Amino acid sequence: MATHSALTTLSNDLADAVAAAAPSVVQVHGRRRPASGVVYQQDVVVTSARALGREDGLQVRRSDGTAFDAELAGWDPATGLAVLRVAGLGTNPVEVSSTAPRVGNLGIGIARSWSNNLTA
């Protein structure tokens, strides 16, 4: 019974973490299909550089469906990450832990689907 209780607690904690991060997960439009990004700082979104495909005509869509024009601020070929500036996005940044993860720690992938639904 203790294992079942511990797994239930872990499952609930993971669901709470997804719910807390969900508003900060956005859709990024830079190719034919949208990708996901995360609001890292106010009006700053981090996404996959491969998701962009171009430097102009970029858009970010919040969870409520509102779209905003985005500007490519830069990208890092070593990590494959791109940074977008999105004026007036008005979405709170994701809370980032000050503790570095260890190899073997659990991680959760959270994304916005093609229809802008949350997946984890």
Q: Where on the chain are the PLM-derived regions?
A:
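Long, charged, low-complexity terminal extensions
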Residues: 10-11
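PAS-family sensory domains
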Residues: 16-17
